[in-house]
């Protein structure tokens, strides 16, 4: 039986469906009540015959108005679970009807919160969600593309043909469709037609998994299967103040830490072999390790070195290895280079089981122009500013988020919550914060636009960062939020309710530059640059600083840490030992980049891996041993971390002996525990009778010496400790006469139980 629906109307709708221009398919398709009857109307491109299977009856569907619109009339509501028997190209299959499920997925409150930028769990609605609706299994798709003319779901199960699954336009610029039969692992994209007739194929901005590069499709993935084992870790993390804990971070890039041979197979958890992901075209015999392999190799290594945290350079999905991960296209997906999202969850779980926190680099400042990504998403500048003077980083070739748009801000803030909630990460480091804060960042005059007050500050980005940090600590009070901010923007680590940006740590870029400039000098000229190693103390309590020697310092012709140092090979190693020991005893949390812990000799290469063969040589073994012991010593001495951000925690003994390039200071904790004396000699000249003042007389045990032979030093020192003399110097009546080895740092602990 045919219907009495106006012929012209159906023909026009059919034409729009065939041309992929229909934005309200539910107005035509699925069960429709009409003049006391129910009409089931479907859209089935390329089908030659369709039958409706409902309540045990089979009804032939006719095509009275358009060759691919099939319909059948029923006397009662068919419900939603009826099936269709479809014949296409001689092949018959049965399926449920996508257009039987008319009701909205995104509720009114969801839409309201999203529109105002405050839906902290928006990923639970956006993207592709496996579910069962009235006993029918499939995937619910939801996308934000307000200016699109039409949107369709492309996938393996519809031959990547946008005609098969047009989505329904909803309020607020949303598009929805439930597709029965789509399963976990199904590849998909969105086909977006613009108002001017262009067509783009886009990956899902909220996709939970993506294909391995260079492929760019999204992958239907579950969020609810992994069973976490880290309840105790999470409970303890959120109950403590992260700032009065020891924090020593191993920054690393998963793809260039170590490689495996391509003929070393990896078997997935379900027993199926996994195709190797090549490390680089120029290294065809090497493949990337997987998340499980990294868990087996990386976690024990970092734990043995004594670090408290692993910091991962960006692991959100990105198409280009050469971006180091900083040009993200898949914000809600761990990169598939190393395995599945659940395998990454297991990696984090293993870290927590071994006492290691996990920090990831988060990049909310910009995004790439790749065609499948966020750029010009719905035919308009949806995620970015339209004016390149505020919407583009020309030097980087990337686009800048439009932080004034609520939905864009929501996308990013919810992404932050997502990583903490879904993957149990413990902290973030926000990359290139300065590029977000200043409208004229890397821009010549005439190529930037002032803010509403005529200034260079990006007030929209400021409000976004404040919102992101406020929401983060609201949900996860024990989290770390670290800013890489290279200017003197005030109050970066002050709470948002005090007008700060709300981070709880900031990389001390000034300290890093001063230290490297100083240590690159010929030691005999360091006396003229004493300020480089002392100046940081005068501002160290203005922010909560983290001292970082990062990946940025060992690329682009900057050489590696070892080769920055002057002198012969022994002196180079001694300089590195002294630098690291000064870093570990200086106020502030710690971060070093992979390879620095054993004296990597080449620059970091994202397509290579570390020079592990160097550990067959004693100087490199010694450097690694030094880092091991520094971390062990650091964690055991609260004076080195308990009061990092309280002026009581540090006091100079002498910072003015520039002639000898020697400094001395105390580290202590306000709770009255032990305190330490640190003496550093930054020249190749040793001193056998060097005197420093101390506040209390007695015995001072030498508890750390970078010149120890186990680190590659010459084993000069103070025979395990020294007694004080009544000799007034540096404002103290008691003093120590010390042997100071060349290019060394010594640490002493006052022992009140041992007599003079």
Curated annotation (Swiss-Prot):
Q: Which GO terms describe its cellular component?
A: cytosol
Q: List the disulfide bonds.
A: none
**By its UniProt entry, which InterPro entries does this protein fall under?**
A-amylase/branching_C, Branching_enzy, GlgB, GlgB_N, GlgB_N_E_set_prok, Glyco_hydro_13_cat_dom, Glyco_hydro_13_N, Glyco_hydro_b
Q: What class of enzyme is it?
A: transferase
User: Which GO molecular function, any one, fits this protein according to its record?
Assistant: cation binding
Q: Which family does it belong to?
A: Belongs to the glycosyl hydrolase 13 family. GlgB subfamily.
Q: What is this protein called?
A: 1,4-alpha-glucan branching enzyme GlgB
Q: Which gene encodes it?
A: glgB
